Amino acid sequence: EVNSVKPGQQDLVFPWIGCGECDACKEDRESDCAAMRIIGLKQKGGFATHCLVENDKFLVDIDGLDAADVVPHACSGITVFNALEKMGALRSDEWIAIMGCGGLGMNAISIAGAMGFNNIIAVDIDNGKLEAALEMGATKVLNSQNDDAVSELQKLAEGRLMGVLDTFGGAATGRIAVRALSKAGRYLLVGQAGGDFQMPQVWLPQKAMTVRGSHVGNSPQLRKIIEMVRQGKIKQMPIDRRPLSKINQAVHDLENGNVTGRIVFQPDEND
């Protein structure tokens, strides 16, 4: 019997459901659960009009907010928030680069600014997306198709590039990141485009570099983000609202890089 929620209640679903038994789950670190059951991947509920949520701890109140605007935070929002927390604070004269200006990168720029990262360089190969990145709060931008992308990134960061958040995760972004970082810099990888890049192992001790992965985020972090949205701290990234029946065209547009921000599907009128 369900008595903790009411019909018509507007909630955002946290989809990264942990096993509930391991130490990570008991500490609300669902993203570290080795047996995570993801709604939409490992259990039904993605690209659907309904889904089953087993516990109200995975529901976040969004009453009064536009659901389409905030729903990306249950994926891209917590992903970059979690990674930026792991990154740690930077000094006022230090810089962070955000590699990739897709939906994940756009949210990263906005959330990084809300978390106190003041010097942000957005990196992408699409000038249109770089323009959008400036509107989202990036301080500077770099088109990494430039043959001198490493040195250009170092110049833009005034020799103080202490953090890179890679939201793409390809061979090219990894290669640029580890070469451009200043000594004691931190490379956080969240993107999963795939690929390999090489770097001399000796760079890790000689540059005192941190290379770390981060996977999605946790339910308390989602609540923090939604509270930041309510407080007006997070700038709204572009949202492309489409009917669920147009999903195939949306996938095609994503594959061809024709989307700025995030696509959010909404049920068709007859659903």
Residues covered by each model-derived region:
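Glycine-rich beta-strand-centered segment in the early N-terminal region that forms part
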Residues: 1-23, 63-65
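Mid-domain Rossmann-like dinucleotide-binding core that forms the NAD(H)/NADP(H) cofactor-binding site
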Residues: 8, 64-147, 151-152
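A general structural signal for well-ordered alpha-helical segments in protein cores
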Residues: 19, 48, 59, 77-80, ...
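NAD(P)H dinucleotide-binding glycine-rich loop of Rossmann-like/cofactor-binding domains
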Residues: 19-99
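Glycine-rich cofactor phosphate-binding loops and adjacent beta1-alpha1 units
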Residues: 88-91, 115, 125, 131-210, ...
